[in-house]
Amino acid sequence: MELKLIDYNGQSSASVSASETLFGREYNEALVHQVVTAYLANARSANRAQKARSDVAKSTRKPWRQKGTGRARAGMASSPLWRGGGKIFPNSPEENFSHKVNRKMYRAGIGAILSQLVRENRLSVVENFIVDAPKTKILAQKLKDMGLDQVMIITDNIDENLYLSSRNLPLVKVVEAGYADPVSLMRFANVLITRNALAKMEEALA
């Protein structure tokens, strides 16, 4: 299939052939949901912790005798039923949030997202994308001239000037072809891919 190749003015100057397998897939909502959910789950770090009844600093002495007081039975002050007691099912740093997605499914999910971007006219290819100096103003003006806002730029290797220029733009993300994740592809309104990055993605995913 053919993808539009645009210039720095945002005009379609030519077209570039692309893999039908990667950019011509049907949109599979269930598969995309599974891939995105797995990506977000695998990005989580188990850094939360709560105390169980064995972790709280409470005495193990029985608060009062078992019978004869008229009060409810109580074994120790660390009981989850008591204020200041432990939690019944506490969160732990050892929690495992990872979801496994087969490589074939992941590639198919990325392909479905890219294909949908093409159908929605949100994906463009550029010959190369460089910034002459590490200035946010230069990059912002270049993207404005191209008619791109809230854009993810995918390159074959990250140019230092481009990376430094994009850091202060919250709606711009620059990544290498091997690090284009499904969440970012769906989150940004536009995706701009350099020609060399397109070849790398086809080699890795098609």
Curated annotation (Swiss-Prot):
Annotated GO biological process: translation
Domain of life: Bacteria
GO MF assignments: rRNA binding; structural constituent of ribosome
Biased composition (Basic residues): 59-70
Residue span of region Disordered: 50-77
Gene3D superfamilies linked: 3.40.1370.10
GO cellular component terms, A-Z: ribonucleoprotein complex; ribosome
Keywords: Ribonucleoprotein, Ribosomal protein, RNA-binding, rRNA-binding
NCBIfam families: rplD_bact
Purpose of the protein: One of the primary rRNA binding proteins, this protein initially binds near the 5'-end of the 23S rRNA. It is important during the early stages of 50S assembly. It makes multiple contacts with different domains of the 23S rRNA in the assembled 50S subunit and ribosome. Forms part of the polypeptide exit tunnel.
Family designation: Belongs to the universal ribosomal protein uL4 family.
Subunit and partners: Part of the 50S ribosomal subunit.
Record-given protein name: Large ribosomal subunit protein uL4
